[in-house]
Amino acid sequence: MEISWGRAMWRNFLGQSPDWYKLALLVFLIINPFIFLANPFIAGWLLVAEFIFTLAMALKCYPLLPGGLLAIEAVIIGMTSAAHVREEVAANLEVLLLLMFMVAGIYFMKQLLLFIFTRLLLSIRSKMVLSLAFCVAAAFLSAFLDALTVVAVVISVAVGFYGIYHRVASSRGEENDMLDDSHIDPHYKTVLEQFRGFLRSLMMHAGVGTALGGVMTMVGEPQNLIIAKAAGWHFGDFFLRMSPVTVPVLICGLLTCMLVEKMRWFGYGETLPEKVRDVLQQFDDQSRKKRTRQDKLKLIVQAIIGVWLVTALALHLAEVGLIGLSVIILATALTGVTDEHAIGKAFTESLPFTALLTVFFSIVAVIIDQHLFAPIIQFVLQASEHAQLTLFYLFNGLLSSISDNVFVGTIYINEAKAAMENGAISLKQFELLAVAINTGTNLPSVATPNGQAAFLFLLTSALAPLIRLSYGRMVWMALPYTIVLTLIGLLCVEFTLAPVTEWMTQAGWLATLS
């Protein structure tokens, strides 16, 4: 018997999302116009809370859908205007270009990145050294590339290796289903569990590595570029400005990596079983023998393009997104990727998030039009200049750990710049606040998958169920890093940021907007 029209519509609305989630969104959409008529300020804050809710529930439904519906309604009922949304999008065009072209560009360098991480995994026998190598490699790559892409590459390596061993353990060859353990021989099961623990720890080290490296440069995370643009900083300026906080945090983060591996705390410390290493080594040896001269040349070309990417970013030869576009053109032209559909696959990772970011800017337009953050900013600005840095860092950190750090960073840097333009703070103080905002959005956000897009990507990937990486386990394994990164970042903002920045300015290393 066919279902009713009403039931069919309910099933179509947000698809497989839970009924309670659908109902919650409908309630939001119904009550918002009435609350806006009664009190626009409260309605604005309610909209922000609802939007943060959709971000926190990203595993139930991709936030673009519910967040987009809320944003459309906000424009219709007059909380902001379509013209203001367009202005916000236009002002952040560089960020949209970064997401569209840089992420797609790195997609065509995946072979090189896969080669690097495969060599690391099979060449280094010490688990502590291997974990450190993965963390450092992810940090370095994320400083110049998109963190999502770096995590995607490490996931590809892990899924590939897991599949190879799972096939051997189940003795089912190409018909093997990696999610089905029913055919695993009993003596392989213990080894498989150990291998899962090994992969879980490597993935978490790599994920945190992307946060450690991503905070250091203006292209490491999307919000970095927004903050750099507001402050008028180029690549080198941004790196130097952040270094009083980010360099000590990087060192302490790497020490944490070594400590949790050594002490086997928080689910870390599992080593690669020798049986698994033998299987993977045999597979790699076969793959290397099959590698043709054409394949080797592709790796060399990708490495040269990588050098061009780093050089172009460091010297600011063009806008970041345009450098990414040049990577797409060079990588496809010189490695023989000519099919439109093959090129189109490169954009599948970045475009949903680019669309979501455009929705972010709609909510930012509401925040500006309704002056939602004015009371918070006034409260912070009443404090001493020294205390302002700590408060901005903590407010950003708290929100970023439960919401998306791009959203949070965009809001706070806009408010800080408005305060400077209104004469409430000096240019020098604004530049210090920009560092506090950037580090506040990037470092504490490792606490949950909601804050870091790379963590959320890992949690929703095909790898997570294979290695038994749940939301709770990810939060638990991230906990030591959350504590260390947040506290060291706070101490550096409190004690080293202002004096080191002053020293670099006097030494002539830094320029200002004035």
Curated annotation (Swiss-Prot):
Transmembrane segments: 23-43, 63-83, 97-117, 120-140, 144-164, 202-222, 238-258, 303-323, 357-377, 391-411, 447-467, 475-495
GO molecular function, one term: sodium:proton antiporter activity
UniProt KW Cell inner membrane keyword: yes
Pfam families per UniProt: NhaB
Gene Ontology CC terms, in alphabetical order: plasma membrane
Record-linked HAMAP family: NhaB
Family: Belongs to the NhaB Na(+)/H(+) (TC 2.A.34) antiporter family.
Name assigned to this protein: Na(+)/H(+) antiporter NhaB
Species the sequence originates in: Salmonella schwarzengrund (strain CVM19633)
Gene that encodes it: nhaB
